[in-house]
Amino acid sequence: MILNKEKIKNYAAYLYIKVAYDQAHSKMAHTVYFTNFYRSSKPLFLDEEDPINPCFQTISMGGGYVSGEIYRSDFEINDDARCIITTQSSAKAYKTVDGKTSEQHTNITLGKNSILEYISDNVIVYEDGKFAQFNNFKMDSSATLIYTECFGPGWSPHGSAYQYEKMYLNTKIYYDDKLVLFDNLKFQPRKNDESAFGIMDGYHYCGTMIVINQQVIEDDVIKIRDLVKEKYPDMDMIFGVSRMDIPGLGLRVLANTYYHVEKINAVAHDYFRRKLFNKKPLILRKP
């Protein structure tokens, strides 16, 4: 539910989206609320063969995160509802001038038999920037989640990467109230050599995809590996695919451009849209 006004005041911007299945009219009803720099597009319908699956583009009007600002998003996908949520463009965290860390908190709830495709663009942290992202998912075991994220260093006048102070990504997924995934990535290039073997292996961008659905099996892990190798045999990147303890898998990509990460994630996304929904690849039509 929407935060009360007093709690909303604690955030530089707040965004709330709720999607519910309207059985009487066979469509998805939605509620959108936002403050300050946050906006959301009206529901877009990207697939003419799937006219009741809305897509919401989240928009940050301020241009980026300024040091010390805290943003919050709450998304609720009710029982039997489905939607696509995506960012309009990459998020940018700029130089901190007072040592404070910019933060993004996102809380997502998925009800019974709900479906969420949450496709976020990359987070770019610029020189001297400090940024932390906290994602908390609470989902029913009958729900479906497809989620992507990526981060990388921003432009530096020195022409070198890893000039930011801190990048922290914290993702938790609760499955029937049980914590099944705790992904904790912390990068502090001024304290550690982030380009070293075993960390980023010399690459600049790190991308992640999570797919959770009752139909995901071990054979899907093998198929995703084979599809990526077959489609991009010469791409300069490293990737890995692992099955989770629940019906789901994780895909991690290290590459030198967000474009390459996006391409690898798209291979898996297209595969699961066909297998799980019998739908064609998703085209977000971003400028």
Curated annotation (Swiss-Prot):
GO molecular function: nickel cation binding
Keyword set, alphabetical order: Chaperone, Cytoplasm, Nickel insertion
Compartments, as annotated in UniProt: Cytoplasm
InterPro entries the record matches: UreD
Keyword Cytoplasm: yes
Cysteine pairs bridged by disulfides in the record: none
Recorded GO CC terms: cytoplasm
Cytoplasm found in the keyword field: yes
Predominant subcellular localization, coarse grouping: cytoplasm
Record's function text: Required for maturation of urease via the functional incorporation of the urease nickel metallocenter.
Family statement: Belongs to the UreD family.
Subunit structure: UreD, UreF and UreG form a complex that acts as a GTP-hydrolysis-dependent molecular chaperone, activating the urease apoprotein by helping to assemble the nickel containing metallocenter of UreC. The UreE protein probably delivers the nickel.
Record-given protein name: Urease accessory protein UreD
Source organism per UniProt: Ureaplasma parvum serovar 3 (strain ATCC 700970)
